[in-house]
């Protein structure tokens, strides 16, 4: 039992229950049929308790659909369904058939009467409506017209057996296909005179019926089985009656057939060709572009085959057009493929353009359709999200500066709208560590070109495009990011790479002042090697040496030697301590404070004094600091992944050349300066020795007979003047250790 029978059974059972006075107590329903539920319709409850309805069926169905929120459209005169044998039944009276109840062909619908009692109480619309359609043998389709939901009501296809008298079932089918169907075309690629391929479209000689019409030839019973709605069935029957006739003046033998041939070229030429080549055939003009050919089967078949070779349609010139898509190119391509199968559509990469090849008339129709349906896609408003990143190791302000430089670049396209793939690049994070981040491929452009492209992109940026906002909270060391989800996701990907643990460098510094005699007592050959004490002299930077403590027992050990010289008074320990720096650490000086030569150093060791000068000015007092004595500064500490330490060290020995008094400020101050600086690289735990910072001290002593030694001219004969010059050299011993 199919769905239709089940629905009919449900309707009959419901009506029988409504009209029954009493129900026998012995009746048992063995099977309960489930009413079909259409998921495309609404399940809103409807009530139709009208008793015996005698009004027009169209009004009844429209009111039910309207109560559920639908509009209705009828494909035919649905009120003619109440006709019985050409009469309209209203209660006990009978009215004559009028033209208002006829089909478009002028023939009334002769359908059996249907029940007119309707009793639905709070029934779901998607169950009641399919039941009504099945009871009245109707078909429906849900369509969208603007913002309204419309139910399109039509006749359910019916089957008709049409007997034939004079022509065969195959001939009748061929004529029906040519008359009611559409000719099929094929695309052929040929070569022109320049041996270049070009595309042409030509008919295949075959025809296809619409999907609503099915015709099957029954040759054994000489009839046609037709499946269609009533309107199409009547049209097909009328057409067959027109061609199923005996030819006047000649009796068609039992082996004779009749064919309908649709002319492709000139009709007069084909007609004359058939009359000259096949005089035994009867050829008559049929419709606007067809010929009816009757005669012996073999002659008709040979004529049809020969016409397929000589009857050619005129060549349709292929025209090419370029169309620029406003919306989505994929959607427009799919639309053209569905509406115009013979039209060749070729997308041009990502440019949003389509190349259309086809007949001029077809192209004009397609372009007119695109002008109506191709609209720019609505621009979705960008959604703004916010996220807080808690930093553990890096400074929020430094990470903010790094991210702002990254997000300032357009990561999607350059000025030519070409997609730029991201490439991994080794960079330095906010703490000076080496890290790998993804940045746009610059494609070899110069900095000036990049700046010009960035300005052009900024000018072309839509109004609804916003830049990400980054706020550094110094108190909690947090980074607040506000922007689109894509921008926040990009920041979330970069933050873990920047917020990493930074290794520290512990530098043990020992500064030893050795006089000239002590240096001679050391007996060092500055070009020799003593075990693990590798010595080298570089011009202008003093003495640089690398000491390996693990090999100290095999050669010379500097630390016990310096200690022994201290006990003899030949050397003096100026500084012995350690400082700790972070890898990549920048200056420790506060912005806007006093400035001196060590302002940009990551760490400093000083032994001596400081001269502060306050210079008044219109913008405010300017404070300058001059450190004298011994100054040791460390710049740009860096720890490589393999543990290698790189430092830039600068050592200075400054001494005032003249005594500084209050009257000499703020005039020119004269200092003697001895300076050495170098960038050194050594392994974890190794020791570096720097030497060559010379200092010179001159001491003058006067002695003699009091009063007489101070007389001018002859005073030198009664006294003594002793001048002693002492030169000393500073040794700086540095041992670096990586602390993680």
From Swiss-Prot:
GO biological process, one term: protein secretion
Keyword set includes Cytoplasm: no
Signal peptide: 1-20
Pfam family, one: Secretin_N
Localization terms from the record: Cell envelope
InterPro entries: Bact_Secretion_Sys_Channel (IPR050810), NolW-like (IPR005644), NolW-like_sf (IPR038591), T2SS/T3SS_dom (IPR004846)
Entry GO terms, CC: cell envelope; type II protein secretion system complex
Keywords annotated in UniProt: Signal
Primary location recorded for the protein, binned into one broad class: other
Function noted in UniProt: Could be part of the type IV piliation system (T4P). May contribute at the cohesion between the S-layer and the outer membrane by forming oligomers. Could also be the main channel through which trafficking is managed.
Family: Belongs to the bacterial secretin family.
UniProt-listed PANTHER family: PROBABLE GENERAL SECRETION PATHWAY PROTEIN D (PTHR30332), TYPE IV PILIATION SYSTEM PROTEIN DR_0774-RELATED (PTHR30332:SF17)
Name recorded for this polypeptide: Probable type IV piliation system protein DR_0774
Organism annotation: Deinococcus radiodurans (strain ATCC 13939 / DSM 20539 / JCM 16871 / CCUG 27074 / LMG 4051 / NBRC 15346 / NCIMB 9279 / VKM B-1422 / R1)
Species lineage: Bacteria, Thermotogati, Deinococcota, Deinococci, Deinococcales
């Amino acid at each position: 039992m199919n769905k239709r029978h089940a629905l009919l059974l449900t309707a009959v059972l419901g009506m029988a229950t409504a009209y029954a006075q009493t129900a026998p107590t012995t009746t048992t329903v063995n099977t309960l049929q489930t009413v079909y539920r259409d998921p495309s319709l609404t399940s809103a409850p409807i009530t139709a308790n009208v008793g015996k309805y005698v009004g027009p069926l169209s009004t009844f169905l429209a009111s039910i659909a309207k109560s559920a929120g639908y509009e209705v459209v009828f494909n035919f005169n649905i009120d003619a369904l109440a006709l019985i044998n050409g009469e309209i039944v209203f209660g006990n009276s009978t009215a004559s058939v009028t033209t208002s109840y006829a089909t478009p062909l002028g023939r009334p619908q002769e359908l059996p009467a249907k029940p007119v009692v309707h009793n639905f109480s709070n029934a779901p619309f998607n169950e009641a409506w399919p039941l009504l359609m099945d009871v009245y043998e109707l078909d429906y389709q849900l369509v969208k017209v603007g913002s309204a939901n419309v139910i399109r009501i039509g006749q359910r296809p019916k089957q008709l057996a049409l007997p034939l008298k004079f022509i065969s079932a195959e001939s009748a089918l061929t004529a029906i296909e040519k008359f009611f169907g559409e000719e099929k075309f094929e695309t052929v690629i040929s070569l022109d005179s320049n041996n270049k391929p070009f595309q042409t479209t030509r008919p295949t000689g075959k025809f296809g019926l619409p999907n609503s019409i099915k015709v099957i030839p029954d040759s054994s019973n000489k009839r046609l089985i037709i499946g269609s709605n009533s309107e199409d069935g009547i049209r097909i029957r009328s057409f067959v009656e027109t061609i199923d006739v005996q030819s006047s003046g000649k009796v068609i033998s039992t082996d004779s057939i009749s064919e309908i041939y649709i002319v492709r070229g000139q009709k007069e030429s084909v007609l004359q060709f058939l009359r000259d080549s096949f005089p035994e055939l009867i050829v008559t003009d049929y419709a606007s572009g067809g010929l009816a050919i009757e005669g012996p089967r073999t002659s008709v078949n040979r004529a049809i085959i020969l016409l397929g070779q000589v009857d050619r349609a005129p060549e349709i010139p292929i025209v090419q057009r370029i169309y620029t898509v406003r919306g989505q190119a994929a959607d427009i391509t799919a639309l053209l493929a569905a509406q115009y199968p013979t039209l060749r559509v070729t997308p041009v990469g990502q440019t949003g353009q389509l190349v259309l090849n086809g007949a001029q008339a077809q192209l004009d129709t397609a372009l007119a359709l695109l002008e109506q349906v191709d609209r720019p896609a609505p621009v979705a408003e960008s959604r703004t999200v916010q996220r807080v990143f808690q930093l553990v190791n890096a400074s929020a302000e430094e990470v903010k500066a790094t991210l702002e430089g990254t997000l300032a670049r357009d990561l999607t396209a350059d000025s030519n709208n070409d997609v730029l793939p991201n490439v991994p690049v080794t960079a330095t994070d906010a703490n000076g560590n080496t890290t790998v981040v993804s940045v746009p491929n610059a494609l070899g452009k110069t900095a000036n070109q990049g700046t010009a492209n960035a300005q052009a992109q900024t000018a072309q940026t839509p109004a609804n495009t916003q830049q990400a906002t980054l706020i550094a909270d110094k108190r909690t060391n947090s980074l607040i990011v506000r922007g689109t989800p894509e921008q926040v996701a990009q920041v979330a990907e970069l933050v873990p790479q920047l917020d990493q643990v930074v290794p520290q460098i512990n530098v043990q510094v020992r500064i030893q002042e050795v006089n000239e005699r002590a240096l001679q007592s050391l007996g060092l050959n500055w070009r020799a090697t003593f075990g693990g004490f590798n010595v080298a002299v570089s011009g202008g930077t003093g003495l640089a040496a690398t000491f390996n403590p693990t090999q100290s027992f095999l050669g010379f050990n500097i630390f016990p030697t310096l200690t022994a010289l201290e006990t003899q008074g030949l050397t003096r320990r100026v500084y012995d301590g350690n400082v700790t720096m972070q890898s990549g650490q920048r200056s420790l000086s506060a912005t806007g404070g006093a400035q001196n030569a060590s302002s940009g150093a990551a760490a400093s060791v000083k032994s001596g004094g400081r001269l502060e000068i306050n210079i008044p000015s219109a913008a405010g007092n300017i404070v300058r600091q001059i450190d004298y004595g011994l100054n040791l500064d460390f710049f740009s500490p860096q720890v490589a992944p393999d543990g290698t330490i790189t430092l830039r060290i600068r050592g200075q020995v400054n001494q005032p050349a003249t005594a500084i008094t209050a009257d000499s400020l703020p005039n020119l101050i004269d200092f003697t300066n001895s300076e050495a600086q170098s960038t050194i690289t050594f392994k974890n735990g190794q020791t570096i020795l720097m030497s060559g910072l010379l200092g010179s001290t001159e001491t003058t002593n006067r002695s003699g007979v009091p009063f007489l030694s101070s007389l001018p001219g002859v005073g030198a004969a009664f006294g003594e003047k002793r001048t002693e010059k002492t030169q000393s050299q500073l040794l700086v011993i540095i041992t670096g250790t990586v602390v993680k």
